[in-house]
């Protein structure tokens, strides 16, 4: 087995390792140790299971009591009560119990859904993350946020439930569609924008190599982003403070996702447009020079990501943002930049927010 690079999310007795490397699904003693003697439910989607489902089953079956593969339809629409219920039905049919293990094999949708299935099954069982998309590898697989969507808002139903292990096999990215790759780059850009301008500048330099799936560039970005995410989660697991900074671009972005209908805009695409809007708000609040907004917009554009939002009535955006998870008594709270590499949270005057939205519609 190739030696993975190991990062640790330091949460005391609930700490866990993140493995990053190539070929980690071919041979993996740590992953097998987690599954040893247990009933394992490998939850994946209709795109990923045909490619990697049998591989993960073959890796775990020799040590597990049983391996059950559960497949949900690909796409954001699967983050719903019906799919969660179907997963629990299949687990109960297979007689999984409180000692069983769930493995989330796929992108961010599968990770969120399978993680919530683990958090809610028999009051909580162990799970491991095997992210196969760039977005999941650099962001959503780390930190323990799990959940499903509601018609009124994204990720409105869920729980914090930390994985026991994250296995990020960079080899899985070679099968990732170019649109999904670009969506993952939105989260890479976000990490640099909120926490490390030098990293953001390196991402800009590496962008052609990242879009070409060049292994060294991808590994560099994944490790750097995971270090930022792991440090933030260790400092603020439950999002009482600094972890909210990871939602830069998400207040505007979630409004785009909900308004368009889940899955019409990929999460990373919506966050990309949302970051431009949040950065413009930062400029108008006097927190960041306009030149840095232009720099961020150029980097986002270079990743083949949108920088403008759908041309809906501004009132529609405000209605969706009022039930954002960061909202305080229905008043939106925004993550803004005190210059590239430095994030903060703030409220903003509604008239100013309206102007920002209106100026960034297609």
Language-model segments: residues:
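ATP/NTP phosphate-donor binding region
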Residues: 1-101
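Residue-level signal for inorganic ion chemistry
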Residues: 21, 42, 80, 131, ...
